[in-house]
């Protein structure tokens, strides 16, 4: 009986360690968490926000969610059109995967004809190691 319990605990430990659960990395210097940004929004200004990528390739848009401190930010990497018709260049997400911790450099949008309040338009994505 004791061996079975030890074996079961060993299997459970291996499962937990290999499940892909990645602890939140230390907050990068100069970057805001999603909560910090949404509690004190800074619109149309270049800022850095960090968080975990989720829903990449799962949404009906060229966007993903960035999550930190239990809040999500809607991050757009393509199809970014200003009210005056100016099209922003797309940013590659080929090296980014769901579950990656990243820093995004870009702008929080205040809402317009082609975008919603608190959409984040990214200019650069950097994976946090």
Task: Show the residue positions of the predicted features.
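OB-fold and OB-like single-stranded nucleic-acid-recognition modules
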Residues: 16-129
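Sec-dependent bacterial lipoprotein signal peptides
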Residues: 1-19
């Amino acid at each position: 009986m004791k061996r079975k319990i030890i074996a079961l605990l060993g299997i459970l430990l291996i499962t937990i360690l290999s499940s892909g659960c990645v602890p939140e990395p230390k907050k990068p210097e100069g970057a805001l968490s999603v909560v910090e940004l949404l509690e004190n929004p800074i619109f149309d200004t270049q800022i850095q926000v960090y968080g975990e990528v989720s829903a990449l390739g799962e949404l009906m848009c060229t966007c993903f969610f960035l999550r930190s401190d239990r809040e999500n930010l809607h991050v757009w990497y393509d199809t970014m059109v200003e009210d005056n018709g100016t099209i922003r260049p797309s940013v590659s997400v080929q090296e980014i995967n769901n579950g990656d911790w990243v820093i995004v450099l870009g702008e929080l949008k205040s809402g317009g004809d082609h975008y919603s309040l608190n959409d984040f338009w990214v200019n650069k994505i950097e994976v946090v190691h």
